[in-house]
């Protein structure tokens, strides 16, 4: 699936390709995707496609016969699916009843300077932190990967984002116009909840937590990035292939 277009260009190409076409005019890949998300509909139906709302999880909104489906689009490797200030994320953790001692351990991992607020004078890398405090990371992971919490994280990172007022993703599409892999919201949740992901870093199922920039050299130009957490889905394509295989075997 070699492709040099950027993520935004790819989204634009998908929208432009789909918009105002009849289903029967699509290539086999896109026809299959449309039938997946809309079910068995008339091939004479005309597709309306547009960009999702700025800052929200759906990248593309598809409407056919007044039925709306919201799609998150991904491509390439090392897919970053979410980022926000760590202080906002900590407030979210409190709101879903993550114990305060777990939040404290997460903040100490995030800042890597012996404090839970980033004021320490010595900073260490994620690798060094794991060498010293792997037990704390394991405790965090045990809590984060409980089913009730995983569902909250998947909703925040992939499906809806930071506000309950935001639109919710119906399906995730990985690829371009010519070739793609996909899964519905329910398939993704079921896959993440029902599988064990053994990682030595902080994770939420197959999604991994990282700091945008630990700023180990105290560079004032990147200091603000130290305040931001990111979530990546490095195994996205492989996980979608597994979901597709499971779907075909049902």
Stretch-by-stretch model annotation:
Residues 1-58, 62-69, 74-250:
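Short, positively charged
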């Amino acid at each position: 699936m070699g492709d040099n277009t950027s993520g935004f260009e790819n989204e634009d190409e998908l929208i432009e390709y789909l918009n105002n076409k009849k289903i029967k005019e699509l290539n086999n890949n896109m026809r299959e995707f449309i039938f997946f998300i809309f079910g068995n509909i008339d091939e004479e139906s005309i597709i309306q496609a547009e960009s999702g709302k700025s800052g929200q999880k759906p990248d593309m909104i598809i409407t056919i016969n007044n039925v709306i489906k919201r799609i998150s689009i991904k491509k390439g490797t090392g897919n970053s699916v979410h980022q926000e200030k760590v202080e906002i994320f900590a407030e979210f953790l409190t709101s879903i009843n993550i114990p305060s001692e777990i939040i404290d351990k997460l903040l100490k991992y995030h800042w890597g300077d012996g404090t839970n607020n980033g004021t320490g004078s010595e900073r260490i890398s994620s690798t060094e932190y794991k060498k010293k405090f792997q037990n704390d990371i394991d405790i965090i992971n045990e809590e984060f990967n409980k089913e009730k919490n995983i569902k909250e994280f998947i909703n925040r990172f992939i499906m809806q984002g930071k506000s309950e007022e935001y639109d919710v993703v119906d399906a995730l599409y990985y690829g371009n116009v010519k070739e793609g892999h996909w899964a519905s919201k329910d398939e993704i949740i079921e896959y993440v909840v029902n599988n064990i992901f053994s990682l030595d870093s902080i994770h939420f199922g197959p999604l991994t937590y990282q700091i945008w920039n630990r700023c180990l050299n105290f560079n004032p130009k990147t200091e603000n990035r130290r305040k931001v957490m990111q979530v990546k889905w490095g195994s996205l394509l492989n996980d979608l292939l597994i979901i597709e295989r499971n779907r075909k075997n049902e």
